[in-house]
């Protein structure tokens, strides 16, 4: 109950009690005064009768006694000698208004002039019909009504006076609930005004500190993964991501393409053409490459060395790489002519296919060799290191057929991988999906870009959530996490379906569901995600953000969204004990989550040294082959192990 409501109720109660006690006291005083006055009148009649009985008999005095009885509303007079009735006189009934009732009182008066005798007088109660008359009760009713109206107006006035304090209290509640930013700044109507201004000042300082912390986190990320000059990913980050893919922790046979893109040596050109012109041309080509690679989901572009750029294309084939190289050369051909560069001999591309199990240095050496071969061919061209490798890719038609068959058959194969706390207790199990194409299994990292490309993400996510809910009944002790695409989650139709589906589940089941979202998509669609995340949180479902650290995004979303888990990308965890920049980045993410309910978990943990380093940097839990590898989901298992060695 709010302060204004409490205070108004308290004042109303006190005023009401005061009025009630006053009315009760006045009524009792009025009643007693009337009764006292009337009893004295009746006693005066008894005294007059006693005086007349000295000289006359009772029967002779009947007319006089009757007149006295009428003046005092006495209805019967009994003359008693001790307890024996000597005489009695009753007055005939007089006119009474319709609806009136007779209430009688009795009074015995000893006769002073006739010792041993007494008069018993029965008279009408003067208050018996008082409240039956509108004229007599109208002033009292009007007074009570006036008091009630004044009390109502006083409470209204009091509420208006305290409305500013109520606004301040409401804003304080919103702040305690975690709201920040310009939405919780005060207004001129809040009271006390100095308290409101002080609160606004503190909020602005907190907002500035948060922005500075976010800029610092972004700076740390850029230091760990960004090239200073171009803003692209640097060589260290590129090699780290390639090594993570080559390790293939899920053992699904990852593959892809590395493209080495060599531009002219701009350091030599600056001696001839000047630094400013060369820099302008360099950034023109860099922007062209960056914009071009954005067309391909999952592609990673990095400045590898001086004028050499490297592009990592996971799950792509040589045929697709040749098409990409041809389109890139056509894009370069559209640049305007200039005297500095020969547009027909400006770019050389080396293409190298890689498979899981290879070495990073080996793959990059092959790409370098292919780039040199492209340069020897002359003109804008590309070269492939070894085109004898069997193709593992699929065309769009085959991909669509495979995905539609998977959806029609009930969804992909499910695997589970536990995430454990520092103590070794299982926090949740992540459900990981794979498709069997007839020969081998395909991981979700490979087929999900095609699901998004074909516009089947909403159908796919509905199927996955529908499969997740029955599993909660099989394992009532397990928290289950599943990845959901942000593209589906921001659609109103999917939001309505998700709300209706979750409301059909028991609350205890909803609390064990964790929805995982990619950090890059969260940072891009944060404003559209806020309402739906509030919805799922209100239903008891928890939210996690994975692939943290993969892309250069601000960490401001951590304060704006109620997220339970932040999962680090495996590339950030790999050999972290040897990479101080990655340790600094992890520590900054942990500090960004301080003051919130968000916990940081690491994924792809392979060794004890990595795990110990992560614990030292404040990570709450981990997931990876160091604890347990992915296992097929088996509904025949009644209970999974709840503890793993750490």
Swiss-Prot record:
The keyword Cell membrane applies. The chain crosses the membrane at residues 10-30, 135-155. Induction: Expressed at low levels at both 28 and 37 degrees Celsius. Residues 254-387 form the GGDEF domain. Disruption phenotype: Dramatically stabilizes CsrB and CsrC RNAs, small RNAs that sequester the global carbon storage regulator CsrA; also decreased transcription of CsrB/C. Decreased biofilm formation, decreased expression of DgcC, a probable diguanylate cyclase and of the curli regulator CsgD. Decreased expression of the curlin subunit CsgB, decreased curli expression at 28 degrees Celsius. One of its GO terms (biological process) is RNA catabolic process. Residues 152-219 are annotated as: HAMP-like. Keywords: Cell membrane, Coiled coil, Membrane, Transmembrane, Transmembrane helix. Residues 194-224 form a coiled coil. It is a multi-pass membrane protein. It is found in: Cell membrane. GO terms for molecular function: cyclic-guanylate-specific phosphodiesterase activity; identical protein binding. Changing residue 584 to A: Decreased transcription of csrB. One of its GO terms (cellular component) is protein-containing complex. Serves as a specificity factor required for RNase E-mediated decay of the small global regulatory RNAs CsrB and CsrC, it is probably not a nuclease. Nor does its activity involve c-di-GMP, despite its domain composition. Positively modulates motility gene expression, is also required for curli expression. Removal of the transmembrane regions (residues 1-156) has no effect on csrB translation, however removal of either the HAMP-like region, EAL or GGDEF domains obviates the activity of CsrD. This is RNase E specificity factor CsrD. It comes from Escherichia coli (strain K12).
